[in-house]
Amino acid sequence: MIRLTVPSIAQVESLAEIKSRLREKGIDVPLVADVHFSSEIAIAAAAVVEKVRINPGNFHKDHEKAKEQFARLVEVCKVNGTALRIGLNHGSLGERITNLYGNTPLAMKEAVMEWLNMCIDNDFYNVVVSLKASNTYVMTEAYRLLDKQMQEVGKRFPLHLGVTEAGNGDGGRIKSAVGISALLSEGIGKTIRVSLTEDPENEIPVAQYLADRYDNRLHSTMVSLTLEGKKATAVYNSPSRERLLLDFSCDFGKRLLDKELDEVVLKGTYIEEGNEITLVDSEYAAYLTDELMQAARRRFYRPEYIACPGCGRTMYNLESTFNVVKKRTSHLKGMVIAVMGCIVNGPGEMADADWGYVGEGNGMVSIYKGKTPVLRHVPETEAIDKLLELISQP
């Protein structure tokens, strides 16, 4: 599957050309159009590609018009055999929904159910659903609520899981593992994506690990577990550093999220490159435990970062910029800082952030305080300094 950003109606013609050239070469990988802020683009793309992703929060500004346009989209999908992903993000909930339910997991569930009910009314079931958030608690609760309601109404659409804007490095992997594994362990979810602000291929090993683990092809390397009330002591014998990190996250992320445990002590060994057995020392154990507690929203020892993986709308080096922002803000414990690839989705999808760095394109950046842009058209070369200046102001 290849997903392509489609920001304007003109790009729909490019989609058709891309598809034609691929098919001429005997490449039949399905194409997915990722569409935001335009129901007309979604309708046009549905006649070309195998799947269209829409976001209910920005499909159309007017709710009644959105329902009319969605009915048109469904008909085009039916005629062309096109699948549909209803992909809601926590940060882009519409004002009508948040006025009714707040900015909550319940609001996410209710928003998606409105659209699924329209699918049911139109006898259209070629649909997959996602309810992503950068907050693992919000993400897991939203999926649980939706899964429960779909069971109650007797219509279970497949769920695509992911923690959006998870960031990079160990933190991004741990956060993704915590959210996704909590749901997979409950039998919720059919497909997954691990979203990292890194080269895209780095997402695959983590996603493959999760798929293998919850399809019973892979098991934890934990060799012993001691429980004393809400404190757990776990000992591992892992074949690699990353395997230890992922096993630890999956074994205890859900229990921490659901407050079954309050503390985890990590011990054991892992194998470094060169087959050298390495003892998990107290410093590394504390680091992984801190990262896990932060990912599970139980204790914050550093800033919380929100960073998208980038897409066709990103016009700057997102990963390197994010790494610099992390380095220069590492002392701001508990603050939520977002680094987003584009002005199209960035402001909405970083709704939880205290501060945001959002690419505009053409070498310019917008800086946000909460949901409000406080500086626009800042040259990239100055933007991080400006962000830090603003943060330091009383």
Kindly label every feature range from the protein language model.
Residues 89, 96-332, 336-339:
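Catalytic alpha/beta core domains of metabolic enzymes, predominantly
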Residues 344-349:
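Acidic, divalent-metal-coordinating active-site segment for phosphoryl/phosphodiester hydrolysis
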Residues 331, 354-355, 364-367:
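Catalytic-core signal marking the mid-to-C-terminal active-site face
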Residues 362-365, 372-393:
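Beta-strand/loop-dominated core regions that host nucleotide or nucleotide-derived cofactor-binding catalytic loops
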